[in-house]
Amino acid sequence: MILTRRSALTLTLAALAAPALVRPAAAACSFPDLSKGITFKRQDGSRGLARREGDGTVVIDYVTNRGSWLDRRRVKNGIFEMARVVEESEEPVVGASAPDYKWTYSPKITLPEDGATWAGRVKEVVEVTISDERGTVERQRTRWDASYRVFDPREVKLSGCSYRALSAEAVWQGERGTISQRWVYFPELGLGLETKRNGRANGIVAMGPA
């Protein structure tokens, strides 16, 4: 068959357009595994990493991309923080170590399920090591009355994956004032991530495997 120049041009244009008509299937959701590590991003641009340890607790680094800024927490049952080391500065801080918080709860903490509540006493110990010849450790103890509640079951979508989610809130009251927190908890992952602290929101905008 002999093609005219117009026919050849028409076939060429059709061939070039063909790939655009065949759209690739949507990429499959890459569902994260907490034992292998889960990365996330918050509204303020901070990127974090969560990973389940061998003892079942979860270590969450809330800031991994802002220089010397440090916010590392050890969590049990999704939302109960057992320890936290925090230094809110992008530049190195000299003269003392970052404050190291540890908490114990009484009575026994619960699992976060829709409608679950917990109320009890929290004992806090915070230590700071001074950079002197003796490596002096300053220690402060505080007791809090705390209450937790879990509510609002729903589905959320992050980075192309859909997750079952719950909201959780906590209020701590003591001689140092009041602390309030909110998390989004993902039952299928066993992971809770803070989205609000003392009235300041900082939600999760992306999440995926490490």
Regions found by a protein language model. Name each.
Residues 1-15:
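N-terminal secretory signal peptides and thylakoid transit peptides that target proteins
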Residues 15-16, 167:
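Generic hydrophobic alpha-helical segments
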Residues 20-29:
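C-terminal segment of N-terminal export signals and the immediately downstream linker at the start
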Residues 28-95, 99-102, 125-210:
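Acidic, serine/threonine-rich low-complexity disordered tracts
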Residues 108-122:
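Surface-exposed helix/loop patches within compact recognition domains
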